[in-house]
């Protein structure tokens, strides 16, 4: 014969199970976004991150403004071609990289520099994303999962560098390895498609080198023997908006 308390334990266990099941169902009915967010975070970003991501690597850039020529936009053109952006941009076209001319107060020497997603170690765009569409790979690259992005644009407001764009218009002539989508937010990916193919250079750095300026150096910041690490040790560098303590992966010399 069963102990008299066995049926009580079984009933209690059944009630707990049914209670959890009901709570789960209520969660789906009342707040479907919660479950979708968890699914997106568990599957979407990790799948989108690709098998090429290496936790021992931190990809980054060094921009030497003393070598960056005012009026030169070869880096912008190369980025547009590589990623299938508009060859003739309109006011609403996406900009993954843009040239900015500055004249620092008290110095009087104009500066020209490219600004793109800074691939922060503490990215505010990821913090504010309600669906998990904005995420950071283990190798430091900050990306957007376009299957999960709902176009709320909170990340655009959170980015202190204004480095993200919203796709307003239908897209044509997309690159197979650079999927994009109307109604989504996007930004510089450090040419992640190249990295995952084993190529260790970005289109903008390659184009800048071809001009002879060599103002953009791309590489692994965690490798002490990489060119970017050697250059960072040899010259003074700063981050844009260093006061925010976001630890950007893009460093600048000469600002």
Language-model segments: residues:
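Hydrophobic/aromatic-lined pockets within catalytic cores
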Residues: 22, 26, 84, 196
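Cysteine-centered iron-sulfur cluster-binding motifs in ferredoxin-type domains/subunits
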Residues: 62-82, 109-132, 143-162, 180-211, ...
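C-terminal segment of N-terminal export signals and the immediately downstream linker at the start
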Residues: 11, 31-70, 237, 242-255
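Asp/Glu-centered strand-loop micro-motifs enriched in Gly/Pro and often flanked by an aromatic residue
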Residues: 5-9, 46-54, 67, 102-108, ...
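Non-heme iron-sulfur electron-transfer modules
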Residues: 37-50, 80-113, 135-148, 163-186, ...
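Long, compositionally biased charged/polar accessory segments in the mid-to-C-terminal portions
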Residues: 196-199, 203-255
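N-terminal secretory signal peptides and thylakoid transit peptides that target proteins
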Residues: 2-25
């Amino acid at each position: 014969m069963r102990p008299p308390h066995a049926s009580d334990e079984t009933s209690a266990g059944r009630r707990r199970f049914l209670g959890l099941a009901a709570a789960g169902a209520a969660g789906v009915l009342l707040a479907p976004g919660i479950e979708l967010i968890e699914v997106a975070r568990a599957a979407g970003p990790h799948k989108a991150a690709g098998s090429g991501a290496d936790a021992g690597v931190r990809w980054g850039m060094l921009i030497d403004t003393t070598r960056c020529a005012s009026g030169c936009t070869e880096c912008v053109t190369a980025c547009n071609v590589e990623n299938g952006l508009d060859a003739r941009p309109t006011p609403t076209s996406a900009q993954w990289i843009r040239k900015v001319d500055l004249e620092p107060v008290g110095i009087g020497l104009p500066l020209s520099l490219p600004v793109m997603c800074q691939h922060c170690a503490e990215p505010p765009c990821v913090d504010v994303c309600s669906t998990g569409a904005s995420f950071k790979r283990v190798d430091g690259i900050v990306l957007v999962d376009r299957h999960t992005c709902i176009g709320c644009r909170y990340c655009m407001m959170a980015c202190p560098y204004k480095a993200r764009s919203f796709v307003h218009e239908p897209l044509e002539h997309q690159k197979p390895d650079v999927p994009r989508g109307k109604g989504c937010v996007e930004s510089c990916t450090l040419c992640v498609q190249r990295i995952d193919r084993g190529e260790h250079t970005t289109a903008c750095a390659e184009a800048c080198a071809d001009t002879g300026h060599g103002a953009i150096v791309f590489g692994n910041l965690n490798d002490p023997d990489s060119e970017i690490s050697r250059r960072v040790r040899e010259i003074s560098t700063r981050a844009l908006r260093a006061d925010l303590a976001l630890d950007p992966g893009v460093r600048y010399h000469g600002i």
